[in-house]
Amino acid sequence: MNTGIDLQGSFIESLKQLGLPDGVAKALWIPLPSFLMIIGATVGVLVVVWLERKISAAAQQRIGPEYAGPLGVLQPVADGIKLVFKEDIIPAKADPWLFTLGPVLVVLPVFVSYLIVPFGQNLVITDLNVGIFLWISLSSIAPIGLLMSGYASNNKYSLLGGLRAAAQSISYEIPLAFSVLAIAMMSNSLSTIDIVQQQSGYGILGWNVWRQPVGLIIFWIAALAECERLPFDLPEAEEEIVAGYQTEYSGMKFGLFYVGSYVNLVLSALVFAILYLGGWEFPVPLDKLAGWLGVNDNSPWLQVITASLGITMTVLKAYFLVFIAVLLRWTVPRVRIDQLLNLGWKFLLPVSLVNLLLTAALKLAFPVAFGG
């Protein structure tokens, strides 16, 4: 089996060949993955914003952005620059410290969660044994920032939006965790790398989408609720509470909420692809393709091609899910707050618990198919 390309080892070895000491080469590697993570997440957000505008325009028989760059691809960049230079206003009776800290608490955990997202066999910043559990834990911090922002704004609409965000997150965090736990039970690990490897070897037939159809639906609904996407955008419903917790924000602080929302959407799509769609795995096993073509598994060129295809497959799967989320925005109407809570507590929670127990029973009965 091809173990993939070792980026860290190759980078350090290249610097050592240039004459740098081993310690210096390793020190230069340390900040590089985090820097690339931030750059990649930011570029991903710009692409998603442009795609959402174009897809939304097509759904409404409009053109969408077209003047800022070819096909309007620079429109998200222009919007970002506009937000950076806008005046940052803090309401007179707001709590300035909590008002400023709120957006940071919303964005920071989302960026940190990218540490455990693998794009290939060795293309991950840190392969933690509890990687997927870390993502669930970090996703629980963002609602605290939203509630803090709503409370600190000293605005009734902002406070109501923050309370809605907290209630929504608590309602859907548990079904989300149960659906992830079912995957971890089948994979015998909480590591994102191990979860993808458990789906390898049989191509598309080995993906968890076939073994966890109920968990897949629960995870997707809960992920949309966690990202506050329609039909679950009650914390910032314009027709009801102006802009929710964002009402009093402007400038870069408002931009942080904007960026955090889309970064979280891309992150949820990536995690979905890792858990249910085989992550970086190709629909046809590349090892078998290499064998049919007579290519050596240890060939350096095959390692480079495998790494490139792994990144491409992961990104394509994630953006396909983003495309579905954008279509849902213009297809499904917003639910009421009572419908939102009833769906989470009275339907998704018991169904996710039954799915978890059923997965445990199937693992004992059919250990080969369910990772026993």
Curated annotation (Swiss-Prot):
It is an enzyme of class 7 (translocase). GO terms for biological process: aerobic respiration; photosynthesis, light reaction. GO terms for cellular component: plasma membrane-derived thylakoid membrane. Its EC number is 7.1.1.-. It catalyses: a plastoquinone + NADH + (n+1) H(+)(in) = a plastoquinol + NAD(+) + n H(+)(out); a plastoquinone + NADPH + (n+1) H(+)(in) = a plastoquinol + NADP(+) + n H(+)(out). It is found in: Cellular thylakoid membrane. The chain crosses the membrane at residues 29-49, 97-117, 130-150, 176-196, 204-224, 254-274, 308-328, 347-367. InterPro entries: NADH_UbQ_OxRdtase_su1/FPO, NADH_UbQ_OxRdtase_su1_CS. Keywords: Membrane, NAD, NADP, Plastoquinone, Quinone, Thylakoid, Translocase, Transmembrane, Transmembrane helix. GO terms for molecular function: NADH dehydrogenase activity; oxidoreductase activity, acting on NAD(P)H, quinone or similar compound as acceptor; quinone binding. NDH-1 is composed of at least 11 different subunits. HAMAP family: NDH1_NuoH (MF_01350). NCBIfam families: PRK06076.1-2, PRK06076.1-5. PANTHER family: NADH DEHYDROGENASE SUBUNIT 1 (PTHR11432), NADH-UBIQUINONE OXIDOREDUCTASE CHAIN 1 (PTHR11432:SF3). Belongs to the complex I subunit 1 family. NDH-1 shuttles electrons from an unknown electron donor, via FMN and iron-sulfur (Fe-S) centers, to quinones in the respiratory and/or the photosynthetic chain. The immediate electron acceptor for the enzyme in this species is believed to be plastoquinone. Couples the redox reaction to proton translocation, and thus conserves the redox energy in a proton gradient. This is NAD(P)H-quinone oxidoreductase subunit 1. It comes from Rippkaea orientalis (strain PCC 8801 / RF-1).
